Amino acid sequence: MDLGPIYNTRDINDGKVINIDNPNYTNPVAIKKNENNNAYQFNHLKTLGLYIQNTTYFTDNFIITGGLRYEYFDQVVGRSTLKNIRSGYLAQKDGKLLYQLGSVYKFTPNIATFFNHAESFRPQNNRTLIINGELPAEQGKSFETGLKYENAYLNATVALFNINKRNVAETVNVNGTNELQIVGKQRSRGIEFDLNGQLTDNLSIAANYTYTKVKNLENHNNKLAVGKQLSGVPKHQASLFLAYNIGEFDFGNIRVGGGARYLGSWYAYNNTYTKAYKLPQAIVYDTFIAYDTKISGKKVSFQLNGKNLSNKVYSPSTSGNASRTLIPVALGYAREVILNTKIEF
């Protein structure tokens, strides 16, 4: 049994932006105090959770796990002036009893099937100018089932999943003012494959493929959104990384590795769902070389990481639904080389 509070305070003040194509770092933009009534956004959130869980072995091959969890939150969210005078805010509290259930059946010592079901209860995170009435917590139900293979060297998993959410909130522009409103329901379903472990004593692998279909099931604000894929979620994602341990030498141990990540294409929409932009697919290559040794009897590790070796311009995500005309697109990092050093005392 676990009992514990979490308290989080966050204050945000929007400042000016710089030109990403021609940034000027030597003459930074002066940050001025904002005296407007709605200049500062705050979100004071307290959450409390209490759960109990039990695992039962019906046989050596059949295992069931069940649990109950009570989630409670106390939230004050809104906007304020520089002197912390609240110009518009919402105070609400709520709680819900959730349950989860899981099972595992082993066909052989190496092969098993599994099933999991869980519920979620999450308070809304408001960052808009106006709070339009109470914002009930987002609630979800998830189901997952699949097969798992595991031996002394490798483990592989294939799983089907389905996640339904309701009380989904969205920023809605009302007469030129952004409001956070409950708009409806969303669903995410797909299949995932994972492979991890040792191919040989020196060669390891980490591979993953995910197909995800995420769409709006219901949207009270805009009927055009129904059936559309959610922004920022490519249908196809995959990665493959290999690492090879070259071996021990008089001066230390050397490991090298590398691989690629694949992001499929997807559509991003403006807030009226009348305009769309197709984000192109991308393959990004990463690599590393690591060296472990001892200096004065202390373990020392050096690792040189190279990310996005081909300097590919790509988008890992989109914000989505920003305005009638703009579709914000986040850019992935450019080619990056990082050297990390660790000393164990």
From Swiss-Prot:
Belongs to the TonB-dependent receptor family. It comes from Haemophilus influenzae (strain ATCC 51907 / DSM 11121 / KW20 / Rd). GO terms for cellular component: cell outer membrane. This is Uncharacterized TonB-dependent receptor HI_1466.1. PANTHER family: BLL7968 PROTEIN, FERRICHROME IRON RECEPTOR-RELATED. InterPro entries: TonB-dep_rcpt-like (IPR039426), TonB-dep_rcpt_b-brl (IPR000531), TonB_rcpt_b-brl_sf (IPR036942). It is a multi-pass membrane protein. A motif (TonB C-terminal box) lies at residues 328-345. SUPFAM superfamilies: Porins (SSF56935). It is found in: Cell outer membrane. Keywords: Cell outer membrane, Membrane, Receptor, TonB box, Transmembrane, Transmembrane beta strand, Transport. It comes from the Bacteria. Residues 1-345 form the TBDR beta-barrel domain.
